[in-house]
Amino acid sequence: MRLHGAIVLLAALLALVTAQQRGGGRSRGGVKGSAWGGRPAPFRSWDTARYRPWQEGTARQNDCWRGGDVTFDISNDAPTLVGARATFSIALRFPGTQTVLPDGRVVWSQNCTVNGTRMLQGDPVYPEQLAEGSDGVFPDGQPFPRSAWGKRGRFVYVWWTWGRYWQVVDGATSQLTVGTDGVALGSYTMEVVVYHYRGRQRFIPIGHASTQFSITDQVPIAVDVTQLEVAAGDGGSFVRNRPVAFNVRLHDPSHYLRDADISYSWDFGDQSGTLISRSPTVTHTYLQAGSFAARLVLQAAIPLSSCGTSAPPVVDPTTGPVPSLGPTATQPVGPTGSGTATAPSNLTGSGTAAAPGTTAAPRASGAPAEPTGVSVAVLSDSAATEPLPDPVLSTAVADAAAGTDPTADPLPPTSVSSGGDAPGTVAPTAVEGSVAAGVGTAEDVAAATPGATAADVAVDTAGATDGDAVGPTAAATAESIADPTAGATDGDAVGATAESIADPTAGATDGDAVGPTAAATAESIADPTAGATAVSSGSATAGATAEPLLLVKRQAPEAEPTGCVLYRYGTFSTELNIVQGIESVAIVQVVPAAPEGSGNSVELTVTCEGSLPEEVCTVVADAECRTAQMQTCSAVAPAPGCQLVLRQDFNQSGLYCLNVSLANGNGLAVASTHVAVGGASPAASGTTLTVGLLWAPLIAAALGTAAYTYRRVKYSPLLPTAPTAPRPHSWLPPGATLRLLLRQAFGGAPSGESSPLLRANAV
């Protein structure tokens, strides 16, 4: 018995010591900002025999790699939209005398001597020992996947953040992709320690690195603002009367928004209105100079794959709550311990709140490759923040525009059966401490209610004291009055879109809130006390005995539940400096220069509109304007107007293409013309000297055609019948076709009608 008791006591002591050792290696600090202690602090277990913890700055760690130090290039694709996937990349940079082969081995790239040992080019830095079976395990004891057996140049990467860790076996480059579902918004640190396999169950730590990343609920965007055919000026200036291009670039490396419906709302700041487009590229022309603030609001409607397609259940408004047809936005809760906002609970993904789904996509030799192995562990005792509902989903922009409190309970939209053929849905408005005024007058309301007069309506509305709200909104029209909506409290107004107000509002007393809504399926006036929180018995009786109003039932179209769409927004704004540039250039005159020298010189008169130029350049090219032969530039003296007289000398006679460009700090304008030098008569005006020679044949042909046409269609009166005169002898018969053609061609026809039939002459 004593021996048995001693064994039990020793076993209990051993269990206690083991528990203390495990508990001493754990850290229960916050998820963010935890200091690196050589291994993930809340690690479930750590095999120190195989994986020695990394200790920064120790002499043992300084000589962990033969031939020099190994550095790391670590990066991530943040900022990451909450719900998307974040990717982390790391690449090992070995000493300059070493290189990585395509199969993953690290070898010497040249002959060298290290610590007195001669190294030959192509030899491995460390002898390769292929681990199989029990030799290949992760730090927490999980075995390598079979795909990692027999691999060369293996490294083990232990990633850690959010109180969780991921283990990946890979080559000299590796990637880790994790989900962000349920992660609170904010900035985080991803840390990684790298181990190299040396054989015999030995994994040597070679370094530690970290990178900062952020999780946001704003769509990350960048906008490129450019203007074509404008010289680049200082300060990002743009020229008026020329289109400015805006190109939006989404930062979505994980393609989280690939199925989203994205719209862009532009306000260019020049009082030109709002442009809504679904194209990421738009252009806008500023007509005035000055400073303008261009703003963009991007809306992404993301379909949720986990949402069902069934229609919302139909609830009797007199017996049950009114179902909310608005976006499924949950109410905000208190801030988390880290003081950041929380992610929405209705986001979908492969991960969960405790363990976001992860995938490993390692790379080798600079190209993507399949992962050799990955192990994901979740900490049961970590301080990771539990996912909380996002207080702002699709209602964020609406609350900001209306100035309402997003923490208040959202009012359900009102289903309206309008007089037209297409029923709609409108959202009610809430007004505190005031009386909502409808668009209809008292007479309109009375006319729409059988048995009610304008005076009755006035009495009904006058019965509501301070703090009451009676008045439908003017968002749409309806033919029916339904039950008051639930949740109307003292001082609130539940708006109804209706054309008539029935008698249930007559019984409202002090402290009551009456707000009828328009229901599509209601056929009669129901009990007005169903949706009010403080209604007296007298008002209930008055409302119940009111004469019912006959309504027409209409079938509302089945709409997709709005809770199946998640709305995310992105914003951008920038200041644009619009200046007046050189808007146009024209060569109005080209004349020969004064007769001096060789005579191969011309003078050009150039005018421009807009700002004054600071520099003028002329380029002389061949007749096809392809090969430049001469270029000259000169400064332009200040002048009150933009008119220049330029002199251009040519080496020899011929036809040339002359290009004139005017430039200043705000823009550039160009004009071209052809110039014929030597032998050609100069043109007094126009853009070329050869215009007369080129157009002369065409003008002559046009004049001849006009004269012939006039001769053919000219009217001639019929002449009186005259006796037939004797005709001279001719070798052609009078009615021959050739004779008639020659007569018409050479004008030999008489001035009268040429047809002998009309002249009553014998043929």
From Swiss-Prot:
According to its UniProt record, where is this protein mainly located? other
Q: List all Polar residues biased stretches.
A: 327-347
User: What keywords appear on the UniProt entry?
Assistant: Glycoprotein, Repeat, Signal
**What the protein does?**
Might be required for polymerization of melanin onto the core structure of melanosomes with enzymatic function of tyrosinase.
Which CDD domains does the UniProt record give? PKD
| Repeat listed as a keyword | yes
Record PTM text:
Glycosylated.
In the record, the effect of residue 399 to N is given as:
In strain: Dun and Red jungle fowl
InterPro entries associated with the record: Ig-like_fold, PKAT, PKAT_KLD, PKD/Chitinase_dom, PKD_dom, PKD_dom_sf
Tell me which Gene Ontology terms the entry assigns under biological process: melanosome organization
Annotated stretches, region: 4 X 24 AA approximate tandem repeats of T-[AD]-[EG]-D-[AV]-[AV]-[AG]-[AP]-T-[AP]-[AG]-A-T-A-[AE]-[DS]-[IV]-A-[DV]-[DP]-T-A-G-A: 441-532
Q: What is this protein called?
A: Melanocyte protein PMEL
What is the residue range of the signal peptide feature? 1-19
Report the sequence similarity comment from the record. Belongs to the PMEL/NMB family.
Extent of Low complexity compositional bias? 313-323, 348-371
- Write out the ranges of the annotated region (Disordered): 313-372, 402-428
Signal as UniProt keyword: yes
Query: Record's Gene Ontology CC terms?
Result: melanosome; melanosome lumen; plasma membrane
Q: What is the effect of changing residue 232 to V?
A: In strain: Broiler
| Protein localization | Melanosome lumen
Quote the gene name from the UniProt entry. PMEL
User: Where are glycans found on this sequence?
Assistant: 111, 115, 346, 651, 659
Q: Which Gene3D superfamilies match?
A: Immunoglobulins
List, for all copies, the residue spans of the domain called PKD.
223-323
- Effect ascribed to mutating residue 34 to P: In strain: Black Langshan
